[in-house]
Amino acid sequence: MKSGIGEATGILIVHPPTAKACEPPGGPARLAGALRARGVACRLWDANQEGQLALLGAAALQRDGEGGGGDTWTRRAVRHREENLAGLRSPELYAHPDRYCRAVRDANRLLWAAARPSGVRLSLADYEDSRLSPVRSADLLTAAAAPGANPFYPWFAGRLAEILEETPVSHVGFSLNYLSQALTAFAMIGHIRRAYPALGIVLGGGLVTSWMRSPGWQDPFAGLVDAMIAGPGEAPLLALFGKTPAAGFDRPDFDGFPLADYLSPGLVLPYSASIGCWWRRCSFCPERAEGTRYRPVPPGQAIADLCALTGELRPALIHLLDNALSPALLTALAAEPPGAPWYGFARITPELADRDFCRRLKDSGCVMLKLGLESGDGEVLKALGKGIDPALAAGVLENLAEAGIATYVYLLFGTPAETPGAALRTLEFTAAHARTIGFLNLAIFNLPAYGPETEGLDTGEFYAGDLPLYRRFAHPKGWNRGEIRRFLEREFKREPAIAAILRRDPPFFTSNHAPFLAMAAAHRSADPGRSG
Protein backbone atom coordinates (compact mmCIF):
# COMPACT_ATOMS: atom_id res chain seq x y z
CA MET A 1 0.00 0.00 0.00
CA LYS A 2 1.08 3.55 -0.68
CA SER A 3 2.49 5.31 2.35
CA GLY A 4 0.66 8.28 3.79
CA ILE A 5 -2.85 6.95 3.28
CA GLY A 6 -3.39 6.63 6.99
CA GLU A 7 -5.04 4.02 9.13
CA ALA A 8 -7.25 1.48 7.38
CA THR A 9 -10.72 2.09 8.81
CA GLY A 10 -13.12 0.71 6.21
CA ILE A 11 -13.61 -0.01 2.53
CA LEU A 12 -16.10 0.77 -0.21
CA ILE A 13 -16.24 -2.13 -2.70
CA VAL A 14 -17.40 -1.08 -6.16
CA HIS A 15 -18.89 -3.17 -8.97
CA PRO A 16 -18.32 -0.78 -11.91
CA PRO A 17 -20.24 -0.50 -15.18
CA THR A 18 -20.80 -2.20 -17.57
CA ALA A 19 -22.15 -5.70 -17.01
CA LYS A 20 -25.62 -7.25 -17.07
CA ALA A 21 -27.66 -5.53 -14.35
CA CYS A 22 -29.92 -8.51 -13.68
CA GLU A 23 -28.44 -9.74 -10.38
CA PRO A 24 -26.08 -8.55 -7.64
CA PRO A 25 -22.41 -9.41 -8.19
CA GLY A 26 -21.28 -12.48 -6.29
CA GLY A 27 -17.62 -11.56 -5.76
CA PRO A 28 -18.12 -8.35 -3.75
CA ALA A 29 -20.77 -10.10 -1.62
CA ARG A 30 -18.26 -12.82 -0.80
CA LEU A 31 -15.66 -10.20 0.16
CA ALA A 32 -18.20 -8.39 2.32
CA GLY A 33 -19.03 -11.62 4.13
CA ALA A 34 -15.37 -12.18 5.04
CA LEU A 35 -14.69 -8.57 6.05
CA ARG A 36 -17.85 -8.01 8.08
CA ALA A 37 -17.44 -11.32 9.90
CA ARG A 38 -14.20 -9.91 11.34
CA GLY A 39 -15.50 -6.46 12.18
CA VAL A 40 -14.21 -4.55 9.16
CA ALA A 41 -16.53 -1.79 7.96
CA CYS A 42 -17.47 -2.56 4.37
CA ARG A 43 -19.98 -0.85 2.11
CA LEU A 44 -21.07 -2.39 -1.18
CA TRP A 45 -21.86 -0.23 -4.21
CA ASP A 46 -23.32 -1.73 -7.37
CA ALA A 47 -22.36 1.20 -9.58
CA ASN A 48 -23.22 -0.91 -12.62
CA GLN A 49 -26.89 -1.33 -11.70
CA GLU A 50 -27.30 2.21 -10.39
CA GLY A 51 -25.38 3.71 -13.29
CA GLN A 52 -27.39 1.96 -15.96
CA LEU A 53 -30.67 3.05 -14.38
CA ALA A 54 -29.33 6.60 -14.12
CA LEU A 55 -28.43 6.65 -17.82
CA LEU A 56 -31.79 5.17 -18.75
CA GLY A 57 -33.41 8.07 -16.92
CA ALA A 58 -31.00 10.61 -18.41
CA ALA A 59 -31.79 9.45 -21.93
CA ALA A 60 -35.51 9.84 -21.27
CA LEU A 61 -35.05 13.34 -19.80
CA GLN A 62 -32.82 14.36 -22.70
CA ARG A 63 -35.40 13.30 -25.28
CA ASP A 64 -38.19 15.01 -23.34
CA GLY A 65 -36.09 18.17 -23.25
CA GLU A 66 -35.75 18.00 -27.02
CA GLY A 67 -39.51 18.09 -27.33
CA GLY A 68 -39.74 14.43 -28.23
CA GLY A 69 -37.04 14.69 -30.90
CA GLY A 70 -34.96 11.80 -32.13
CA ASP A 71 -35.80 8.76 -34.21
CA THR A 72 -39.02 6.79 -33.94
CA TRP A 73 -37.44 3.88 -32.06
CA THR A 74 -35.87 6.11 -29.42
CA ARG A 75 -39.09 8.09 -28.95
CA ARG A 76 -40.96 4.83 -28.42
CA ALA A 77 -38.33 3.64 -25.94
CA VAL A 78 -38.65 6.89 -23.98
CA ARG A 79 -42.43 6.66 -23.97
CA HIS A 80 -42.43 3.10 -22.63
CA ARG A 81 -39.40 3.32 -20.34
CA GLU A 82 -41.18 2.85 -17.02
CA GLU A 83 -43.49 0.18 -18.44
CA ASN A 84 -40.55 -1.77 -19.87
CA LEU A 85 -38.48 -1.62 -16.68
CA ALA A 86 -41.47 -2.71 -14.62
CA GLY A 87 -42.11 -5.54 -17.08
CA LEU A 88 -38.55 -6.83 -16.83
CA ARG A 89 -39.06 -7.07 -13.07
CA SER A 90 -42.34 -8.98 -13.46
CA PRO A 91 -42.72 -12.72 -14.22
CA GLU A 92 -45.67 -12.02 -16.51
CA LEU A 93 -43.55 -10.45 -19.26
CA TYR A 94 -41.43 -13.61 -19.60
CA ALA A 95 -44.51 -15.58 -20.62
CA HIS A 96 -44.65 -13.44 -23.78
CA PRO A 97 -41.27 -13.74 -25.53
CA ASP A 98 -42.00 -11.21 -28.26
CA ARG A 99 -43.03 -8.55 -25.75
CA TYR A 100 -40.05 -9.43 -23.59
CA CYS A 101 -37.62 -8.99 -26.49
CA ARG A 102 -39.13 -5.63 -27.41
CA ALA A 103 -38.86 -4.38 -23.81
CA VAL A 104 -35.20 -5.41 -23.62
CA ARG A 105 -34.31 -3.85 -26.96
CA ASP A 106 -36.12 -0.62 -26.09
CA ALA A 107 -34.22 -0.36 -22.78
CA ASN A 108 -31.00 -1.04 -24.63
CA ARG A 109 -31.86 1.70 -27.13
CA LEU A 110 -32.02 4.23 -24.31
CA LEU A 111 -28.55 3.29 -23.05
CA TRP A 112 -27.24 3.56 -26.59
CA ALA A 113 -28.79 7.02 -26.98
CA ALA A 114 -27.47 8.24 -23.62
CA ALA A 115 -23.86 7.23 -24.34
CA ARG A 116 -23.70 8.10 -28.03
CA PRO A 117 -22.63 11.76 -27.53
CA SER A 118 -19.57 10.47 -25.64
CA GLY A 119 -18.44 8.34 -28.57
CA VAL A 120 -19.32 5.19 -26.65
CA ARG A 121 -21.43 2.31 -27.90
CA LEU A 122 -23.16 1.23 -24.71
CA SER A 123 -25.52 -1.71 -24.30
CA LEU A 124 -27.09 -3.65 -21.46
CA ALA A 125 -24.12 -6.01 -21.60
CA ASP A 126 -21.18 -4.20 -23.18
CA TYR A 127 -19.19 -0.96 -23.44
CA GLU A 128 -17.20 -0.05 -26.55
CA ASP A 129 -15.33 3.24 -26.85
CA SER A 130 -14.52 4.46 -30.36
CA ARG A 131 -11.20 5.95 -29.18
CA LEU A 132 -10.00 3.89 -26.22
CA SER A 133 -9.34 0.16 -25.78
CA PRO A 134 -9.44 -1.78 -22.50
CA VAL A 135 -6.50 -3.95 -23.63
CA ARG A 136 -4.11 -0.98 -23.77
CA SER A 137 -2.82 0.29 -20.44
CA ALA A 138 -2.13 3.70 -21.99
CA ASP A 139 -5.82 3.99 -22.88
CA LEU A 140 -6.87 2.98 -19.37
CA LEU A 141 -4.58 5.69 -18.00
CA THR A 142 -6.13 8.14 -20.49
CA ALA A 143 -9.58 7.22 -19.16
CA ALA A 144 -8.31 7.91 -15.64
CA ALA A 145 -6.80 11.25 -16.69
CA ALA A 146 -10.04 12.46 -18.29
CA PRO A 147 -12.93 10.91 -16.32
CA GLY A 148 -15.32 13.62 -17.51
CA ALA A 149 -15.30 12.06 -20.99
CA ASN A 150 -17.00 8.92 -19.64
CA PRO A 151 -20.79 8.83 -20.14
CA PHE A 152 -21.29 7.68 -16.54
CA TYR A 153 -19.24 10.57 -15.07
CA PRO A 154 -22.04 13.11 -14.42
CA TRP A 155 -23.79 10.45 -12.38
CA PHE A 156 -20.93 8.69 -10.58
CA ALA A 157 -19.13 11.86 -9.45
CA GLY A 158 -22.20 13.04 -7.54
CA ARG A 159 -23.21 9.61 -6.30
CA LEU A 160 -19.74 8.84 -4.98
CA ALA A 161 -19.75 12.09 -3.00
CA GLU A 162 -23.07 11.07 -1.41
CA ILE A 163 -21.77 7.63 -0.47
CA LEU A 164 -18.53 8.91 1.05
CA GLU A 165 -20.50 11.48 3.04
CA GLU A 166 -22.75 8.72 4.39
CA THR A 167 -19.97 6.16 4.93
CA PRO A 168 -16.45 7.50 5.52
CA VAL A 169 -13.86 4.91 4.47
CA SER A 170 -10.10 4.75 4.08
CA HIS A 171 -10.08 2.60 0.93
CA VAL A 172 -12.05 2.01 -2.25
CA GLY A 173 -11.82 -1.40 -3.91
CA PHE A 174 -12.87 -2.15 -7.48
CA SER A 175 -14.00 -5.62 -8.53
CA LEU A 176 -13.03 -5.73 -12.21
CA ASN A 177 -14.05 -8.91 -14.03
CA TYR A 178 -14.87 -7.96 -17.63
CA LEU A 179 -13.25 -5.87 -20.34
CA SER A 180 -16.56 -4.01 -20.58
CA GLN A 181 -15.95 -2.64 -17.07
CA ALA A 182 -12.35 -1.54 -17.46
CA LEU A 183 -12.60 1.93 -19.02
CA THR A 184 -15.31 3.13 -16.63
CA ALA A 185 -13.51 1.60 -13.65
CA PHE A 186 -10.39 3.58 -14.52
CA ALA A 187 -12.41 6.75 -15.09
CA MET A 188 -13.80 6.30 -11.57
CA ILE A 189 -10.30 5.60 -10.21
CA GLY A 190 -8.95 8.75 -11.85
CA HIS A 191 -11.75 10.83 -10.35
CA ILE A 192 -11.12 9.40 -6.89
CA ARG A 193 -7.38 9.99 -7.16
CA ARG A 194 -7.96 13.72 -7.79
CA ALA A 195 -11.07 14.40 -5.72
CA TYR A 196 -10.18 12.18 -2.74
CA PRO A 197 -6.37 11.83 -2.74
CA ALA A 198 -6.26 10.41 0.80
CA LEU A 199 -8.20 7.30 -0.19
CA GLY A 200 -6.32 4.11 -0.94
CA ILE A 201 -7.36 2.38 -4.16
CA VAL A 202 -7.36 -1.42 -4.49
CA LEU A 203 -8.01 -3.24 -7.75
CA GLY A 204 -8.92 -6.92 -8.07
CA GLY A 205 -11.24 -9.33 -9.85
CA GLY A 206 -11.07 -11.88 -12.63
CA LEU A 207 -9.73 -9.54 -15.32
CA VAL A 208 -7.03 -8.22 -13.00
CA THR A 209 -6.04 -11.79 -12.15
CA SER A 210 -5.61 -12.57 -15.85
CA TRP A 211 -3.42 -9.50 -16.30
CA MET A 212 -1.23 -10.18 -13.28
CA ARG A 213 -0.70 -13.87 -13.98
CA SER A 214 0.34 -13.38 -17.59
CA PRO A 215 4.04 -13.97 -18.34
CA GLY A 216 6.17 -10.86 -18.06
CA TRP A 217 3.56 -8.83 -16.16
CA GLN A 218 4.80 -5.38 -15.17
CA ASP A 219 2.41 -3.10 -13.32
CA PRO A 220 1.63 -0.08 -15.54
CA PHE A 221 -0.71 1.48 -12.97
CA ALA A 222 1.71 2.25 -10.13
CA GLY A 223 0.98 5.70 -8.77
CA LEU A 224 -2.67 5.47 -9.74
CA VAL A 225 -3.66 2.22 -8.02
CA ASP A 226 -2.20 1.47 -4.59
CA ALA A 227 -2.60 -2.31 -4.63
CA MET A 228 -3.61 -4.94 -7.16
CA ILE A 229 -4.83 -8.38 -6.10
CA ALA A 230 -4.57 -11.56 -8.17
CA GLY A 231 -6.97 -14.34 -7.24
CA PRO A 232 -9.37 -14.43 -4.28
CA GLY A 233 -9.34 -11.12 -2.44
CA GLU A 234 -10.43 -12.11 1.06
CA ALA A 235 -6.99 -12.75 2.57
CA PRO A 236 -5.25 -9.67 1.08
CA LEU A 237 -8.07 -7.34 2.12
CA LEU A 238 -8.23 -8.78 5.62
CA ALA A 239 -4.46 -8.38 5.91
CA LEU A 240 -4.83 -4.73 4.90
CA PHE A 241 -7.08 -4.24 7.92
CA GLY A 242 -4.88 -6.29 10.25
CA LYS A 243 -7.24 -9.27 10.35
CA THR A 244 -6.53 -12.96 9.95
CA PRO A 245 -8.60 -14.89 7.40
CA ALA A 246 -10.38 -18.11 8.30
CA ALA A 247 -9.21 -21.37 6.80
CA GLY A 248 -12.57 -21.98 5.15
CA PHE A 249 -15.24 -19.92 3.41
CA ASP A 250 -17.49 -17.20 4.80
CA ARG A 251 -21.12 -16.85 3.82
CA PRO A 252 -21.67 -14.03 1.30
CA ASP A 253 -23.31 -10.86 2.61
CA PHE A 254 -25.52 -8.92 0.19
CA ASP A 255 -26.52 -6.10 2.55
CA GLY A 256 -26.17 -2.80 0.71
CA PHE A 257 -27.13 -4.00 -2.75
CA PRO A 258 -30.47 -2.78 -4.22
CA LEU A 259 -31.94 -6.28 -4.23
CA ALA A 260 -35.41 -5.24 -5.41
CA ASP A 261 -34.19 -3.13 -8.32
CA TYR A 262 -32.34 -5.50 -10.63
CA LEU A 263 -33.67 -6.17 -14.12
CA SER A 264 -35.08 -9.61 -13.38
CA PRO A 265 -38.50 -10.88 -12.17
CA GLY A 266 -37.41 -11.23 -8.56
CA LEU A 267 -34.06 -11.47 -6.86
CA VAL A 268 -31.45 -13.69 -8.50
CA LEU A 269 -29.12 -14.91 -5.75
CA PRO A 270 -25.55 -15.55 -6.98
CA TYR A 271 -23.49 -18.08 -5.07
CA SER A 272 -20.10 -19.60 -5.81
CA ALA A 273 -19.47 -23.04 -4.33
CA SER A 274 -15.88 -23.26 -5.54
CA ILE A 275 -12.82 -21.46 -6.80
CA GLY A 276 -11.31 -22.88 -9.98
CA CYS A 277 -12.57 -25.94 -11.84
CA TRP A 278 -12.81 -29.52 -10.57
CA TRP A 279 -12.04 -31.02 -14.00
CA ARG A 280 -9.01 -28.94 -15.08
CA ARG A 281 -8.19 -31.22 -17.99
CA CYS A 282 -9.62 -29.30 -20.94
CA SER A 283 -7.20 -27.91 -23.48
CA PHE A 284 -6.74 -24.13 -23.27
CA CYS A 285 -8.04 -24.13 -19.68
CA PRO A 286 -7.57 -20.62 -18.20
CA GLU A 287 -7.58 -22.01 -14.66
CA ARG A 288 -4.53 -24.15 -15.39
CA ALA A 289 -2.79 -21.39 -17.35
CA GLU A 290 -3.28 -18.94 -14.48
CA GLY A 291 -2.34 -21.49 -11.82
CA THR A 292 -5.71 -21.38 -10.08
CA ARG A 293 -6.01 -24.18 -7.54
CA TYR A 294 -9.41 -25.85 -7.18
CA ARG A 295 -10.94 -25.06 -3.79
CA PRO A 296 -14.52 -26.23 -3.23
CA VAL A 297 -16.79 -25.06 -0.48
CA PRO A 298 -17.67 -28.30 1.36
CA PRO A 299 -21.02 -29.40 -0.11
CA GLY A 300 -22.66 -29.44 3.31
CA GLN A 301 -21.62 -25.85 3.95
CA ALA A 302 -22.74 -24.79 0.48
CA ILE A 303 -26.20 -26.24 1.09
CA ALA A 304 -26.36 -24.61 4.53
CA ASP A 305 -25.34 -21.25 3.05
CA LEU A 306 -27.92 -21.51 0.28
CA CYS A 307 -30.71 -22.52 2.64
CA ALA A 308 -29.87 -19.67 5.03
CA LEU A 309 -29.63 -17.08 2.25
CA THR A 310 -32.82 -18.35 0.63
CA GLY A 311 -34.67 -18.13 3.93
CA GLU A 312 -33.41 -14.60 4.50
CA LEU A 313 -33.66 -13.10 1.00
CA ARG A 314 -36.43 -15.14 -0.68
CA PRO A 315 -34.86 -15.21 -4.15
CA ALA A 316 -36.82 -16.02 -7.27
CA LEU A 317 -33.79 -17.91 -8.61
CA ILE A 318 -30.37 -19.08 -7.44
CA HIS A 319 -27.47 -18.65 -9.86
CA LEU A 320 -24.61 -21.02 -9.04
CA LEU A 321 -21.50 -19.29 -10.37
CA ASP A 322 -19.05 -22.20 -10.38
CA ASN A 323 -16.98 -22.79 -13.52
CA ALA A 324 -18.51 -26.26 -13.38
CA LEU A 325 -20.77 -27.70 -10.69
CA SER A 326 -19.01 -30.72 -9.23
CA PRO A 327 -20.74 -34.12 -9.06
CA ALA A 328 -20.45 -33.90 -5.26
CA LEU A 329 -22.33 -30.59 -5.17
CA LEU A 330 -24.99 -31.81 -7.61
CA THR A 331 -25.50 -34.88 -5.44
CA ALA A 332 -25.86 -32.69 -2.35
CA LEU A 333 -28.36 -30.42 -4.10
CA ALA A 334 -30.40 -33.42 -5.22
CA ALA A 335 -30.48 -34.72 -1.64
CA GLU A 336 -31.20 -31.39 0.07
CA PRO A 337 -32.94 -28.77 -2.10
CA PRO A 338 -31.81 -25.18 -1.44
CA GLY A 339 -35.34 -23.80 -1.26
CA ALA A 340 -35.55 -21.90 -4.56
CA PRO A 341 -35.24 -22.67 -8.27
CA TRP A 342 -31.60 -22.83 -9.35
CA TYR A 343 -29.31 -23.11 -12.35
CA GLY A 344 -25.61 -23.21 -13.15
CA PHE A 345 -22.89 -24.53 -15.44
CA ALA A 346 -22.26 -28.28 -15.39
CA ARG A 347 -20.02 -30.65 -17.27
CA ILE A 348 -21.56 -33.48 -19.25
CA THR A 349 -20.80 -36.37 -16.90
CA PRO A 350 -21.91 -39.97 -16.30
CA GLU A 351 -23.97 -38.73 -13.33
CA LEU A 352 -26.23 -36.84 -15.75
CA ALA A 353 -26.54 -40.00 -17.85
CA ASP A 354 -28.59 -41.38 -14.93
CA ARG A 355 -32.23 -40.54 -15.65
CA ASP A 356 -33.29 -40.87 -12.03
CA PHE A 357 -30.51 -38.52 -10.94
CA CYS A 358 -31.73 -35.91 -13.43
CA ARG A 359 -35.24 -36.26 -12.03
CA ARG A 360 -33.93 -35.72 -8.51
CA LEU A 361 -32.14 -32.58 -9.69
CA LYS A 362 -35.41 -31.34 -11.14
CA ASP A 363 -37.21 -32.09 -7.88
CA SER A 364 -34.53 -30.11 -6.01
CA GLY A 365 -35.36 -27.00 -8.04
CA CYS A 366 -32.99 -27.23 -11.01
CA VAL A 367 -34.61 -25.35 -13.89
CA MET A 368 -31.65 -25.10 -16.28
CA LEU A 369 -28.11 -26.37 -16.77
CA LYS A 370 -25.54 -24.66 -18.95
CA LEU A 371 -23.50 -27.31 -20.77
CA GLY A 372 -20.15 -26.78 -22.49
CA LEU A 373 -20.57 -29.34 -25.26
CA GLU A 374 -18.24 -27.36 -27.60
CA SER A 375 -18.46 -29.85 -30.50
CA GLY A 376 -20.58 -32.68 -31.85
CA ASP A 377 -17.51 -34.41 -33.28
CA GLY A 378 -15.87 -37.13 -31.20
CA GLU A 379 -12.32 -36.49 -32.40
CA VAL A 380 -12.54 -32.80 -31.58
CA LEU A 381 -13.92 -33.57 -28.11
CA LYS A 382 -11.05 -35.99 -27.52
CA ALA A 383 -8.46 -33.43 -28.67
CA LEU A 384 -9.97 -30.81 -26.36
CA GLY A 385 -9.72 -33.13 -23.35
CA LYS A 386 -13.43 -32.84 -22.60
CA GLY A 387 -13.70 -36.41 -21.33
CA ILE A 388 -16.97 -36.97 -23.19
CA ASP A 389 -18.22 -38.27 -26.52
CA PRO A 390 -21.28 -37.43 -28.64
CA ALA A 391 -23.17 -40.50 -27.45
CA LEU A 392 -22.84 -39.49 -23.79
CA ALA A 393 -23.84 -35.92 -24.66
CA ALA A 394 -26.92 -37.12 -26.53
CA GLY A 395 -28.01 -39.27 -23.60
CA VAL A 396 -27.53 -36.43 -21.11
CA LEU A 397 -29.54 -34.02 -23.27
CA GLU A 398 -32.34 -36.58 -23.55
CA ASN A 399 -32.40 -37.22 -19.79
CA LEU A 400 -32.47 -33.54 -18.90
CA ALA A 401 -35.25 -32.85 -21.39
CA GLU A 402 -37.28 -35.78 -20.06
CA ALA A 403 -36.81 -34.48 -16.51
CA GLY A 404 -37.97 -30.99 -17.51
CA ILE A 405 -34.58 -29.27 -17.07
CA ALA A 406 -33.81 -26.73 -19.78
CA THR A 407 -30.35 -26.69 -21.35
CA TYR A 408 -28.22 -23.80 -22.54
CA VAL A 409 -25.65 -25.45 -24.79
CA TYR A 410 -22.33 -23.84 -25.68
CA LEU A 411 -20.68 -24.68 -29.00
CA LEU A 412 -17.16 -23.58 -29.95
CA PHE A 413 -16.03 -23.46 -33.56
CA GLY A 414 -12.51 -23.11 -34.93
CA THR A 415 -10.46 -24.90 -32.27
CA PRO A 416 -7.12 -26.12 -33.66
CA ALA A 417 -8.42 -29.70 -33.90
CA GLU A 418 -11.59 -28.81 -35.83
CA THR A 419 -12.00 -29.22 -39.59
CA PRO A 420 -14.88 -28.12 -41.83
CA GLY A 421 -16.10 -31.72 -41.74
CA ALA A 422 -16.06 -31.74 -37.94
CA ALA A 423 -18.02 -28.49 -37.89
CA LEU A 424 -20.58 -30.07 -40.21
CA ARG A 425 -20.90 -33.01 -37.81
CA THR A 426 -21.60 -30.51 -35.02
CA LEU A 427 -24.38 -29.08 -37.17
CA GLU A 428 -25.80 -32.56 -37.74
CA PHE A 429 -25.60 -33.43 -34.03
CA THR A 430 -27.30 -30.18 -33.02
CA ALA A 431 -30.09 -30.56 -35.56
CA ALA A 432 -30.65 -34.20 -34.60
CA HIS A 433 -31.01 -33.30 -30.91
CA ALA A 434 -32.68 -29.91 -31.32
CA ARG A 435 -35.74 -31.11 -29.43
CA THR A 436 -33.63 -31.52 -26.29
CA ILE A 437 -31.77 -28.19 -26.52
CA GLY A 438 -33.37 -25.12 -25.00
CA PHE A 439 -30.88 -22.44 -25.98
CA LEU A 440 -27.62 -22.19 -27.91
CA ASN A 441 -24.48 -20.09 -27.60
CA LEU A 442 -22.29 -20.11 -30.69
CA ALA A 443 -18.73 -18.83 -30.39
CA ILE A 444 -15.60 -18.76 -32.52
CA PHE A 445 -12.51 -19.95 -30.68
CA ASN A 446 -10.11 -17.31 -29.39
CA LEU A 447 -6.59 -18.56 -28.68
CA PRO A 448 -5.53 -17.60 -25.13
CA ALA A 449 -2.57 -15.24 -25.00
CA TYR A 450 -0.46 -17.82 -23.20
CA GLY A 451 -0.48 -21.47 -22.17
CA PRO A 452 1.23 -24.71 -23.21
CA GLU A 453 -1.23 -25.39 -26.06
CA THR A 454 -0.19 -22.19 -27.87
CA GLU A 455 3.27 -23.60 -28.56
CA GLY A 456 3.74 -24.79 -32.11
CA LEU A 457 1.00 -22.53 -33.51
CA ASP A 458 1.69 -19.65 -35.88
CA THR A 459 0.51 -16.73 -33.74
CA GLY A 460 0.39 -12.94 -33.81
CA GLU A 461 -1.38 -10.01 -32.20
CA PHE A 462 -5.15 -10.44 -31.88
CA TYR A 463 -5.43 -6.73 -31.15
CA ALA A 464 -2.85 -4.03 -30.47
CA GLY A 465 -2.35 -3.72 -26.74
CA ASP A 466 -0.09 -4.64 -23.83
CA LEU A 467 -2.87 -6.34 -21.83
CA PRO A 468 -3.90 -9.06 -24.28
CA LEU A 469 -6.16 -11.94 -23.34
CA TYR A 470 -5.97 -13.62 -26.76
CA ARG A 471 -3.63 -14.07 -29.72
CA ARG A 472 -4.34 -14.41 -33.42
CA PHE A 473 -3.32 -17.75 -34.92
CA ALA A 474 -3.21 -19.39 -38.31
CA HIS A 475 -5.43 -22.45 -38.06
CA PRO A 476 -3.28 -25.55 -38.70
CA LYS A 477 -6.00 -27.00 -40.94
CA GLY A 478 -6.80 -23.74 -42.75
CA TRP A 479 -10.16 -23.44 -40.98
CA ASN A 480 -9.86 -19.72 -40.26
CA ARG A 481 -12.29 -17.17 -38.85
CA GLY A 482 -13.65 -15.94 -42.19
CA GLU A 483 -14.56 -19.44 -43.33
CA ILE A 484 -16.08 -20.23 -39.94
CA ARG A 485 -18.26 -17.11 -39.99
CA ARG A 486 -19.53 -17.97 -43.47
CA PHE A 487 -20.31 -21.52 -42.35
CA LEU A 488 -22.23 -20.29 -39.32
CA GLU A 489 -24.22 -17.70 -41.24
CA ARG A 490 -24.89 -19.64 -44.44
CA GLU A 491 -25.28 -23.17 -43.13
CA PHE A 492 -25.47 -23.63 -39.37
CA LYS A 493 -27.92 -20.85 -38.53
CA ARG A 494 -30.09 -21.62 -41.57
CA GLU A 495 -30.83 -25.18 -40.48
CA PRO A 496 -34.55 -24.86 -39.53
CA ALA A 497 -34.34 -26.82 -36.28
CA ILE A 498 -31.32 -24.79 -35.15
CA ALA A 499 -32.79 -21.47 -36.26
CA ALA A 500 -35.80 -22.13 -34.03
CA ILE A 501 -33.51 -22.57 -31.01
CA LEU A 502 -31.52 -19.41 -31.77
CA ARG A 503 -34.71 -17.35 -31.97
CA ARG A 504 -35.41 -18.23 -28.32
CA ASP A 505 -32.18 -16.69 -27.01
CA PRO A 506 -32.82 -13.66 -24.78
CA PRO A 507 -31.21 -10.55 -26.30
CA PHE A 508 -28.33 -9.09 -24.24
CA PHE A 509 -29.21 -11.00 -21.04
CA THR A 510 -28.74 -14.41 -22.75
CA SER A 511 -28.24 -17.21 -20.19
CA ASN A 512 -29.07 -14.94 -17.23
CA HIS A 513 -32.70 -14.56 -18.31
CA ALA A 514 -33.02 -17.92 -20.08
CA PRO A 515 -34.17 -19.73 -16.88
CA PHE A 516 -37.09 -17.32 -16.51
CA LEU A 517 -38.16 -17.84 -20.11
CA ALA A 518 -37.80 -21.60 -19.64
CA MET A 519 -39.91 -21.55 -16.47
CA ALA A 520 -42.58 -19.47 -18.20
CA ALA A 521 -42.62 -21.85 -21.18
CA ALA A 522 -42.92 -24.86 -18.86
CA HIS A 523 -45.83 -23.18 -17.08
CA ARG A 524 -47.57 -22.59 -20.41
CA SER A 525 -47.07 -26.24 -21.37
CA ALA A 526 -48.56 -27.36 -18.06
CA ASP A 527 -51.49 -24.97 -18.54
CA PRO A 528 -52.41 -25.07 -22.25
CA GLY A 529 -55.30 -22.68 -21.66
CA ARG A 530 -52.88 -19.92 -20.74
CA SER A 531 -52.23 -17.46 -23.57
CA GLY A 532 -48.64 -17.31 -24.90
Question: Each PLM stretch: what is its role?
Answer:
Residues 10, 18-58, 62, 128-250, ...:
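Glycine-rich beta-alpha loop elements in corrinoid/cobalamin-binding modules
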Residues 12-18, 198, 210, 303-407, ...:
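Conserved SAM/AdoMet-binding glycine-rich loop
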Residues 14, 18, 22, 30, ...:
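C-terminal accessory regions of radical SAM enzymes
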Residues 35, 277, 302, 320, ...:
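Conserved, mostly hydrophobic/aromatic
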Residues 50-57, 63-169, 215-222, 287-341, ...:
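Conserved Radical SAM active-site core
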Residues 141, 241-270:
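N-terminal [4Fe-4S]-dependent radical SAM core
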Residues 263-300:
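Canonical Radical SAM [4Fe-4S] cluster-binding loop centered on the CxxxCxxC motif
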